[in-house]
Amino acid sequence: MSRKTPIERYRNIGISAHIDAGKTTTTERILFYTGVNHKLGEVHDGAATMDWMEQEQERGITITSAATTAFWKGMAGNYPEHRINIIDTPGHVDFTIEVERSMRVLDGACMVYDAVGGVQPQSETVWRQANKYNVPRIAFVNKMDRVGADFFRVQTQIADRLKGRAVPIQIPVGAEDHFQGVVDLVKMKAVVWDDASQGVRFEYVDIPAELLPVAQEWRDKMIEAAAEADEALLEQYLAGEPLTETQIKQGLRKRTIANEIVPMLCGSAFKNKGVQSMLDAVIDYLPSPADVPAILGHTEDDREAERHPSDDEPFSALAFKIMTDPFVGQLIFFRVYSGVVNSGDTVYNPVKGKRERLGRILQMHANVRQEIKEVRAGDIAAAVGLKEATTGDTLCDPGKVIILERMSFPEPVISQAVEPKTKADQEKMGIALNRLAQEDPSFRVTTDEESGQTIISGMGELHLEILVDRMRREFGVEASVGKPQVAYRETIRQGVKDVEGKFIKQSGGRGQYGHVVLNLEPMPHGGGYEFVDAIKGGVVPREFIPAVDKGIRETLTAGVLAGYPVVDVKATLVFGSYHDVDSNENAFRMAGSMAFKEGMKRARPILLEPMMSVEVETPEEFTGNVMGDLSSRRGMVHGMEEIAGGGGKVVRAEVPLATMFGYSTSLRSLTQGRATFTMEFKHYAEAPANVAEAVINAKKA
């Protein structure tokens, strides 16, 4: 089967924005204008096509990136048909992982901004992720009909906060209630959309006289940006020769793809204005798979390899998302970088070292699926029947192996115990948690060896709340969630010598006799436990020495202060005695345990708490607040630097885990939601006396 759409006419784009910028409505309009969707879905009444999980419709926030394919021939029908694959991305900071993984497989992005709120917190996070993967982007300033809408303020914010060079290619005609349309600066005409046809029909009209000077000023800036694309255009521009419409678009396209400028448009998706010309801009300025560099990877013997976006190259693809579909089971979303693959073909997963048969291949339109026979370079599709693949795995031609660069996922920062409400839910909960962890690499499930509880860990409180909610809805598991917990440890601060342990029971018949003398000393951090046999002259027989070690090890599981595990201690067996008849392994095990407990009490036991390495990325104006707050959490700030490419500061600190619960919520309110943070375990450190006392008392209560 030959290719329906040439790869040059593909656009793989993401639509990214802050939580309320109207991104889902914008996507809905795209689906409507591209003729896929005949009834507009509104987020307000929970009917939007892209927000397909029940919870998303209830909360009105997009949680899962749904992938949709649409076709576009231009607002005026003047383009050959282009195929646009759209990945809708969530705007909430707890779902940053979703944005991250979609950025990895996109060729371009459309950043949606609220004309009133402007560059908001998640916009900054998304911008950083787009920078990380070198994704070219255009900007769409939405909600121009809202009170307080200001297109030019957003342009300034992109420059100041994001250090991006935003180049308006449109300016608004009016704003708030008087928003009527846009001025197309390339054509130097105003565009007015027809309300009766919900914006399908439009006309070019003359620019209102009062707007002409402003339009001319911004057009000059736009042409200058286009002319800087190459020597020939620049010479023509400097010689005072006007650039043609085609030359302007070529110049802007070249610079957008090189990530030097961000073309800026505006509109009101809700009022059916502007999305149509934004689609034209996707075609005019964002790259096709053929415009981006070949994807890099390595062979199984670690030599560098690459794949060009061509059907003639060996098949290579990246699995970027796993979803459980109520009808077909597990869906693996993948982006094809090179070659062709048919349903039924065998593909190789070099990360797992497994061959798998590709079952059905589905193309998704939100959650409506269409079965297709083959996919080619540049396509995004979902596969049924892959058992082994997980997010970030490569799928490739078994005869021409390449391993594409894996995605990097953040470590979870919050943990809670979770237990089923009934015995019947126990097994179902295990299955549900494993399935959810498979879908979401930033969600972990572990078992606490001390308490036996199941611990779930994720990117924030909302993240875990939604996963527990999904367990209930999708798997019918009712679970209760505990308060977040801290894993403390105990150790000793000083050495003690000649600590005795005697276990003697002699009351007729076979008795028990074990007697040991130990020296204890502290070990350096992370030293664990060490046992040394220093017995001379056989005062404790050889065969009983391992029993002493065993007795001490059993005691290490619960320290004398608050019953937490004991770490970093060295025990040396120096003396003891035995009885020919009554001594046995059990007696020496008990004697070892008793001596260790006694020794620990005398060796100034202390409580250790986990310290976390915390990095906060924040806009500059909130740096003081962030540092003050970390100090109030007993944190030690030990470094601060500019974020590369501008746009704020990185604050580095070491903070006790115990004080970090609820931090994502606090940080959000402290910085108007504009900061993000990462947190990972660093080491254990001595807890201050007042903290230790509170923990010990709580444990004894």
From Swiss-Prot:
- Report the GO molecular function annotations: GTP binding; GTPase activity; guanosine tetraphosphate binding; translation elongation factor activity
Q: CDD domains annotated for this entry? A: EF-G, EFG_III, EFG_mtEFG1_IV, EFG_mtEFG_C, EFG_mtEFG_II
Keywords assigned by UniProt, alphabetized: Cytoplasm, Elongation factor, GTP-binding, Nucleotide-binding, Protein biosynthesis
Q: Which Pfam families match?
A: EFG_C, EFG_III, EFG_IV, GTP_EFTU, GTP_EFTU_D2
Gene Ontology BP, a term: ribosome disassembly
Principal location class = cytoplasm
> Gene Ontology terms, cellular component aspect?
cytoplasm
Listed InterPro entries: EFG_II, EFG_III, EFG_III/V, EFG_IV, EFG_V, EFG_V-like, EFTu-like_2, G_TR_CS
Binding of GTP occurs at 17-24, 88-92, 142-145
Localization per record: Cytoplasm
Location of the tr-type G domain: 8-290
Superkingdom is Bacteria
Task: Kindly give the SUPFAM superfamilies that the UniProt entry links to this protein.
Answer: EF-G C-terminal domain-like, P-loop containing nucleoside triphosphate hydrolases, Ribosomal protein S5 domain 2-like, Translation proteins
Under the heading HAMAP family, the entry gives:
EF_G_EF_2_B
Entry similarity comment: Belongs to the TRAFAC class translation factor GTPase superfamily. Classic translation factor GTPase family. EF-G/EF-2 subfamily.
Q: What does this protein do?
A: Catalyzes the GTP-dependent ribosomal translocation step during translation elongation. During this step, the ribosome changes from the pre-translocational (PRE) to the post-translocational (POST) state as the newly formed A-site-bound peptidyl-tRNA and P-site-bound deacylated tRNA move to the P and E sites, respectively. Catalyzes the coordinated movement of the two tRNA molecules, the mRNA and conformational changes in the ribosome.
- What is the protein name stated in its UniProt record? Elongation factor G 2
> To which species is this protein native?
Cupriavidus pinatubonensis (strain JMP 134 / LMG 1197)
Gene for this protein? fusA2
